[in-house]
């Protein structure tokens, strides 16, 4: 479960860097903050593919993500299994099958740290917070690329680096790559992205 939560952190970072359009690192960072401030809601479908180095195989999952400023997030797998993580203020819901677990973020050091990084991400602070990631930004004719090197011990134990790819023409995040220490690789591709469209409040219900 901890690996899933760390993937959610990365996904949050990706959603808020989606509008970067500049070529210089300083300009990109400025535009990230401005874009995050203007993003009230965000929703999309995603396909997650995990490539297993030792087995020469891959596992494909599909789902949906919803975000509402400033402290609501839902990450839901719909195929091949049903699993949902909902963050609503200081409360977290983890739903798997018929089991629902509700956690108070303030009573768990791990969840409190996860929530901090998530919220820093969605308000555009993650790429400037050196406590969490060392970041390298670059651009080409077709895309922007941000390479994140984890600085927190727990993330360093799992990930060697995280690569965010942005479609330069649309100025939207297109793909996230998580390179694990042992060589496995997870790729998350986003599609049908909607920004500042209404989201049903029930999506973020925690009970």
Task: Locate each region found by the language model.
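Short, solvent-exposed helix-to-loop capping segments enriched in aromatics
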Residues: 36, 113-127
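N-terminal leader/targeting segments and the immediate start of mature chains
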Residues: 19-57, 202-207
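Gly/Pro-enriched, hydrophobic low-complexity segments
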Residues: 22, 103, 126-207
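Sec-dependent N-terminal signal peptides
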Residues: 4-14
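Extended beta-sheet lipid-handling architectures
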Residues: 44-46, 62, 161, 190
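Positively charged n-region of N-terminal signal peptides that target proteins for export
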Residues: 1-4, 20
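An acidic-aromatic
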Residues: 64-116, 186
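Short hydrophobic/aromatic-rich beta-strand segments that constitute the beta-sheet cores
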Residues: 46, 73-77, 92-95, 146-148, ...
């Amino acid at each position: 479960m901890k690996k899933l939560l760390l993937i959610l952190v990365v996904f949050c970072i990706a959603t808020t860097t989606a509008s970067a359009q500049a070529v210089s690192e300083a300009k990109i960072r400025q535009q990230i903050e401005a874009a995050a401030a203007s993003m009230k809601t965000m929703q999309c479908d995603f396909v997650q593919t995990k490539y297993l180095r030792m087995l020469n195989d891959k596992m494909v999952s599909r789902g949906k993500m919803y975000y509402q400023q400033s402290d609501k997030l839902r990450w839901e797998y719909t195929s091949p299994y049903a699993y949902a993580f909902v963050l609503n203020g200081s409360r977290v819901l983890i739903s798997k099958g018929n089991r629902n677990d509700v956690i108070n973020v303030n009573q768990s050091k791990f969840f409190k740290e996860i929530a901090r990084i998530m919220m820093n991400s969605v308000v555009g602070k993650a790429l400037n917070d050196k406590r969490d990631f060392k970041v390298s930004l670059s651009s080409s004719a077709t895309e922007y690329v941000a390479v994140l090197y984890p600085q927190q011990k727990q993330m360093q134990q799992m990930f060697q680096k995280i690569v965010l790819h942005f479609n330069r023409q649309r100025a939207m995040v297109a793909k996230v790559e998580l390179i694990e220490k042992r060589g496995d690789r997870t790729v998350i591709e986003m599609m049908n992205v909607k920004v500042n469209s209404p989201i049903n409040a029930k999506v973020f219900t925690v009970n």
